[in-house]
């Protein structure tokens, strides 16, 4: 919060060995704190998950802290910039790779008609792609024949995809 001090000025006039004091005057000096933002946790979600509003906070009191932010990857369905809280949104990843957006937040503290900008805080929003399996070819066999090897693959290029499968006819 701002720190203030009151300065009292008392004028004294001297001439010929005589002096007299005049009326005092006062003024206030206010020193605002450096704008600051509390750390923000990184976020990891999957395609089409809802991200709750991201509310920025500060330890500063006695004034107003305004936050401006930028986003370097709008493909996740978040605007390239804004002010204040990042409103909740549905994260989108329409690719087959993880999408990472770096969000940079800059705080500005205002009090007494004076503002100052503090150091930025950066966090990431990671949106993983939807799990996907490449198309499989149906197999037609005669009784007693073995199937060709069935390999499950994906076009997702990072992370790990685990394939679980079931068979609705266990007599085969």
Predicted feature locations:
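Extracellular low-complexity Ser/Thr/Asn/Gly-rich intrinsically disordered segments
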Residues: 1-172
């Amino acid at each position: 919060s701002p720190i203030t001090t009151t300065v009292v000025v008392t004028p004294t006039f001297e001439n010929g060995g005589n002096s007299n004091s005049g009326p005092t005057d006062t003024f206030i000096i206010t020193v605002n704190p450096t704008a600051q933002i509390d750390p923000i946790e990184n976020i990891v979600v999957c395609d089409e998950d809802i991200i709750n509003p991201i509310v920025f906070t500060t330890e500063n009191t006695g004034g107003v802290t305004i936050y401006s932010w930028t986003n370097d990857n709008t493909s996740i369905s978040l605007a390239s910039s804004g002010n204040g809280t990042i409103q909740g949104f549905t994260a989108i990843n329409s690719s087959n790779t993880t999408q990472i957006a770096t969000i940079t937040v800059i705080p500005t503290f205002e009090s007494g008609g004076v503002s100052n900008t503090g150091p930025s805080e950066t966090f990431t929003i990671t949106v993983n792609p939807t799990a996907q399996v490449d198309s499989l070819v149906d197999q037609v066999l005669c009784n007693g024949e073995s199937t060709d090897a069935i390999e499950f693959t994906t076009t997702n290029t990072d992370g790990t995809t685990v394939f679980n499968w079931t068979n609705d006819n266990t007599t085969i």
